[in-house]
Amino acid sequence: MRLKAIGLGAVALASMAPSLCSPLWAQSASPAKLAIENPVSEEALRQHINILASDEFEGRGPGTAGETKTIGYIAQQWANAGLKGGLADGGWYDPVNLIESHAAGGSLRFINKGKAVKLPEDSIIIRSRDAAVHLKKLPVVYAGFGVDANGKVVADVAGKLALIRMDDPAFGDVKDLRSRRDAVAKAGAAAVFYIVGGEKAPWDIYKRVYGETTTIPSRQSAAAVDGIIRRDAAQALFAANKVDWDKMIAETVKPEFTGIAFTSKADLDATTHIRTIKSHNVVGKIPGKLGADKGVIMFLGHWDHLGICRPEGAADRICNGAVDNASGIAVLIEAAKRLAKNQPDRDIYFLATTAEEMGLLGAYAFADKPVVPLDKIVAAFNIDTIAVVPKGEKVAILGRGTTTLDADIDAITRSLGREPETGLDSNVMVNRQDGWALKARGVPALMVSGSFADMKKLMAYLEGDYHQPEDQPGDKIILSGAAEDADLHVAIGKHFGSVTAWPGT
């Protein structure tokens, strides 16, 4: 995955022409700064943000009236810019069915030698894939992290309730928690429970976050039942089975660990309220001269936010999401206007995703059923939370060092009179944004922005107005840097849209 950046190679440093397939760079005695034709203005971005993040749009929650207004606005703006609907039938709206689950009740009893194991009160959270599940006399196994350093399931879990640690293992290139859970479930476990404790998140947060989830079919748990058991309850279960907790936790990291079977059996009941939320991605397209055989490029950003996020009686109930991510959608609209003026060599797709705030779900849904084969996407650029810093900031590549695109992006950055931020600090957020859903499938996907060049400034936003009602339209939103980044994305689109500037090899 860590590919070295390559040089510009065939990038022609010739005179700039209006056609997108013409070489990008202008000949000059001082070629460091490229003249920007029709630069994006702060006011243009502000107008879109003021609409998308207005109270009328109710925080842009998926499946709400706010969604209907939001996706209609985006599609209309792209159509006005000259884009075509990006679906195979020419449509704009790609359905995404979100599965909302609410743990409505349940019980988990461990029986050891005919006696119930006494557990602390309110120490277990249970959820099921189906509305109701009843399982009796399940064998119980502690399976450590679930898998070993090679990703192989360590214990015999078939037909059993498997307990695995939630914390990340310190060995090997082990997959994430979801992957570990699903590996155990696919090995035949009837139920999978995480052991939690000692983490920063208090129990009430676990109950809220884990007990109420939204996903898509491909991201559902492979386990019929899964849940969380608090560490003090797990310790009581270990003790009832005469297993030394500290010793067994230490054994977990050893290569030879193969789990331990308990003498206890488990009786489990779970009730889950399930409903489907009908949502949509929006897909637009600038048709290229050469078609998909020469590859396509993509710009994406999420349109959704948190909707009505405060209870009745609160002074402000709406999380408007002005910076996150009305600002990104505003940039997508303005970039589309400029890129559509001249036909590129390659198709350029614009994707506005739903349910990013629920776990990148719209992006994952697109990756599951893409409108263009993923291996045809030669470059994808996600735009998110782009109105954080003023103009003049360095340009960070979130995902630097993971694709062959870096050198060209750095050259484009310098051509606009800006400096690349070559550090890797921003890469800590690679898997927290929509581009990750594509990157995980092999697509060269990046974020390019000044907003991620100074992590202190970004954290000031994340620790302040982020996901709060205060993230709303107003003069305090910094748009000078966003306008600069919008111009940068136009230049990126022209460059990678050209098979002369970017052959794609």
Where are these regions (language model features)?
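His/Asp/Glu-rich mid-to-C-terminal helical/loop segments that flank catalytic regions of hydrolases
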Residues: 337, 341, 346, 457-505
